[in-house]
Design a protein with these regions (language model features):
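Alpha-helix capping and helix-loop boundary segments enriched in small/acidic/polar residues
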Residues: 299, 342-345, 393
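A structural signal for short, well-ordered beta-strand segments and their strand-loop junctions
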Residues: 126, 135-136, 156, 208, ...
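Active-site adenylate/phosphate-handling loop in enzymes that bind or generate adenylated species
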Residues: 140, 295, 353-414, 499-523
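Cysteine-centered catalytic environments shared across enzyme families
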Residues: 1-333, 337-339, 351, 355, ...
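A structural signal for short hydrophobic/aromatic patches embedded in well-ordered alpha helices
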Residues: 20, 182, 402, 524-527, ...
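Short low-complexity, flexible loop/linker segments enriched in glycine and/or proline
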Residues: 334-338, 360, 381-384, 572-574
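Adenosyl-5′-phosphate
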Residues: 1-4, 113, 166, 171, ...
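Conserved S/T- and glycine-rich ATP-binding loop of Class I adenylate-forming
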Residues: 264, 369, 495
Length: 645
């Protein structure tokens, strides 16, 4: 895992690339390098910051240059040994043992045809000195980030958006439509970028820059096609051996020349991976977190720690427990900086603190259970939407009576949150809606009217544009399986837009690599070859994964109630962050600029304080958005995000 950057026919390219690379130092503290080459009346520059994981010697240093090709690469190839053997059989001679050299030689031999063969996580740029072409590539599922900015015939790229912002002299303007999307989702979708002009290279695609100024784009992997192929496979009765696929992926993800550990929450996904990893690495360290007792009680959070201890004891894992009682006022601006775009998921803080503790103990690589919920229908929203289909058949008067009764219930008392009431209110907010709208409403923060009421009225068209985009993505498939339609939408939007994005940025802020064995091309293929009826069986989500896990884990772990990799937001918002909430609501920059309406925010605060509704997540995201916007506009020298022109 590393940081990559570069310029192509960009003014003052060397200085810009040096600054880009310097901004990414946290992603690669083990080394740095640059490359330069003339290109007609311009130049190409590549930069790299190295976090050494495989082949710790100098032969793995980057940018790697060999016989007319120059490569700067961020990621890991888990099938590098197989590709190396094939290339050696074709006469290629390698200098070292890094996967970087394997990628370079695979590109030399096969060009873009090598891309579908890569199994791993990656973002890279390769320059051909003979043709003068630069190609940017991002992995199939969007695990690794790659941001770029084009101006005229020039291009600049980097692993993080903050690097582009740092070298453009404050000329990047905030995109108000992206902030609208952020408010809806509490993250910026992968199809959008918080700054106008900048973009994220889409997963499974490449972009080629030519010396004549032309740009060509291509796709080498399409999740929609994979899902459609999986549906046909399921119809034919070709059921995947899911236990074998997950076991193989976990084994491959352990490939490393430095210490590896796991996240262990005590839930199914992390417990399964940890148990499998412990087979190959006896005594492997695992990190788990807990919160201050009073915070956990206030939030009505489940006791995950006892399950993590049980797994560790059973499989001989070195469990390292971290109690999180963070100074959230201090962490909030720090995390906002590292996350690049406004992200309202407090799990990013958990990830950072765990990775920081692991790094301090000498661990560079962590395995995470990220992705299992999206691919195997493990979130509450998946089951809730399935139940909603049946709920919509209930007579209208009965539904209205139930909704009225639940609406009168409080979501919290002074001492304790009432999770069951929160869940019931959430369910009733979308249960009567059409399929796509219900699915969107089941995991986003606002409905259309609420969001428009929160924003500057001029941004209403942006709201409709964001909602239309969600509908288009959700419906863009040929699947006739409702559960797999939800899983596909999550894998295309929720996974790269939120979970993979914050995992990358939070872990790299602590100079730590996080690997995600469930977000593996072979696991994904297997996941979409499983019918929805085997993913949600009765009231059990992830049923097929649980079935596979019983070959390794005890049933009390497999079938325990679902935990939460989250944070005690209600406790933080009502105590630690209450003064900051008041400041942002009454005199924040977003309010003063007109982007957010003061009276709408004040109403949310009042209803939350009264226990009438739970707006803790909404207000947390307003805080993250405020901090992000202050930083963004201070660089740009203006403070109005409401223009959509």
């Amino acid at each position: 895992m590393c940081g990559i950057a570069g310029t192509y026919r960009w003014p003052d390219g060397k200085a810009v690339t040096d600054r880009l690379t310097e901004t990414l130092a946290h992603r690669g503290p083990d080394g740095s390098g640059t490359y330069a080459h003339s290109l007609g009346d311009g130049e190409v520059h590549l930069g790299h910051r190295r976090l050494a994981i495989l082949d710790l010697s100098g032969t793995g240093a980057q940018p790697m240059v060999s016989e007319g090709l120059a490569l700067t690469y961020n990621g890991e190839l888990y099938n590098a040994p197989e590709l190396r053997a094939e290339l050696e059989g074709a006469g290629v001679r390698f200098r070292g043992t890094s996967d970087t050299e394997v990628l370079l030689e695979a590109w030399r031999r096969w060009g873009t045809d090598c891309l579908p063969r890569l199994r791993g996580m990656f973002a890279f740029a390769v320059f051909d000195e003979r043709s003068g072409e630069l190609v940017l590539v991002r992995d199939q599922l969007g695990i690794k980030p790659l941001f770029l900015l084009r101006r005229g015939e020039g291009l600049v790229f980097a692993s993080e958006l903050k690097a582009l912002a740092a070298v453009t002299g404050g000329s990047l303007e905030v995109d108000p439509a992206a902030l609208v999307a952020s408010l809806l989702y509490y993250w910026v979708p992968d199809s959008r970028c918080a700054f106008r002009g900048a973009e994220k290279l889409p997963p499974g695609t490449w972009l080629r820059c030519r010396p004549d100024g032309s740009v060509q784009r291509g796709r080498f992997w399409d999740l929609r096609e994979v899902a459609a192929e999986g549906q046909e496979r399921a119809r034919s009765g070709d059921a995947p051996d899911l236990a074998a696929v997950v076991e193989e992926s976990t084994r491959l993800h352990l490939l490393s020349d430095v210490p590896v550990a796991t996240f262990l929450s005590g839930g199914l996904d992390s417990s399964y991976l940890t148990a499998l990893a412990a087979r190959d690495r006896p005594g492997i360290p695992a990190y788990t977190i807990g919160f201050r007792a009073e915070d956990a009680r206030f939030e009505a959070m489940p006791d995950d720690l006892r399950y993590a201890r049980r797994v560790a004891e059973r499989f001989g894992v070195d469990l390292r427990e971290i109690e999180i009682a963070p100074d959230v006022q201090d962490l909030l601006p720090r995390m906002t900086y590292h996350l690049d775009e406004p992200v309202g998921d407090p799990a990013a803080i958990n990830t950072f603190l765990i990775c920081a503790a692991a790094r301090e103990a000498g661990v560079k690589v962590m395995l995470s259970g990220m992705g299992a919920d999206e691919l195997f229908a493990g979130y509450r929203k998946h089951l809730a939407n399935l139940i909603a289909v049946r709920y919509r058949r209930v007579p209208g008067p009965v539904r209205r009576g139930v909704a009225g009764a639940v609406d009168r219930l409080p979501v919290a008392t002074r001492r304790r949150g009432l999770r069951s009431v929160r869940f019931a209110k959430r369910f009733l907010s979308f249960a009567g809606l059409p399929e796509e709208t219900a699915f969107r409403r089941s995991y986003t923060l606002y409905d259309r009217e609420e969001l428009i009421g929160l924003l500057d009225p001029d941004l209403a068209p942006a709201v409709d544009d964001v909602l239309t985009e969600h509908a288009d993505v959700y419906r863009d498939n040929v699947l006739d399986d409702f559960v797999n339609r939800m899983c596909l939408a999550d894998a295309r939007m929720f996974l790269p837009g939120l979970n993979l994005a914050y995992t990358d940025r939070s872990s790299m802020a602590a100079s730590t690599e996080v690997r995600v064995p469930y977000v593996d091309v072979e696991v994904v293929r297997a996941a979409f070859a499983v019918p929805g009826a085997r993913k949600i069986a009765g009231r059990q989500g992830k049923a097929v994964l649980k079935e596979a896990a019983t070959t390794v884990l005890p049933r009390e772990i497999v079938y325990r109630p679902k935990g939460l990799f989250s944070a005690p937001l209600r406790a933080w918002m009502s105590r630690d962050l209450a003064p900051l909430v008041r400041e942002v609501v009454h005199d924040g920059l977003l309010v003063r600029s007109g982007f957010l309406r003061r009276e709408a925010l004040a109403r949310m605060v009042a209803e939350d304080a009264a226990g009438q509704r739970d707006f803790s997540k909404h207000l947390w995201h307003v805080l993250t958005l405020e901090h992000w916007y202050r930083d963004a506009t201070s660089r740009a020298g203006h403070d109005s995000p409401t223009s959509t022109a």
